[in-house]
Amino acid sequence: RQKRFEKTLSFVKKHLKTDEAILDLGKTNKLSDFLRQNGYVNLANTSGEDLDVDFQIVTKYRAITAFQIFEHMFAPFNLLNSSEGKLIASVPLRLWFAKEYWNVNDRRDCHYHEFSIRQFNHLLERTGWKIKDYQLWKSYDKSWGIRPLLRRFYPRFYIVYAEKQILQADSEE
């Protein structure tokens, strides 16, 4: 986990200034705390609302991060379509040898979407985002077994930096 946090921080530093007001989708967690400890003091988290329905908060920010959030949303299209500015988002990639993640005891802890790179890119493009940079990371899981071994050879995480033109209201002449 620490290695993924450090790679995430490096990617964020490349694209967002530490003094920017940033909305991090999802409740406060170890990664958002790590980013704050490394200078991103204006990072705010959502408070656990259902972002499929209640996503208007994104319109108040021009920089949004979403670290492994969109796979948990039933309809991420709506939130992405409503937001503008800068976006850094990461998703775990669908792997041909692994079943989707589904926690039967907690409906919020399920993957409604297991994205391929092409699918995630298409989602961003359909909602007006232009991908400017991306990275692929392999899993650093030290567990034993066939799946953990295969995850060391196939990219497991996909992180993108994208921008969406902020639409200006037509001025009256």
Give residue spans per PLM region:
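A short beta-strand submotif of the Rossmann-like class I SAM-dependent methyltransferase core
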Residues: 63-69
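A structural motif corresponding to the C-terminal end of an alpha-helix
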Residues: 123-129
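Short N-terminal helix/helix-N-cap motif within the alpha/beta-hydrolase-1
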Residues: 74-78, 99
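Short, glycine-/aromatic-enriched active-site segment of Class I SAM-dependent methyltransferases
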Residues: 89-113
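Conserved N-terminal segment of class I S-adenosyl-L-methionine
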Residues: 1-63, 77-80, 110-118, 122, ...
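A structural micro-motif
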Residues: 20, 41, 85-86, 129
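A short glycine-rich, Lys/Arg-flanked "PGG" loop and its adjoining helix->strand segment in the class I
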Residues: 77-89
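Active-site flanking residues adjacent to catalytic metal/cofactor-binding acidic residues
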Residues: 23, 67, 89
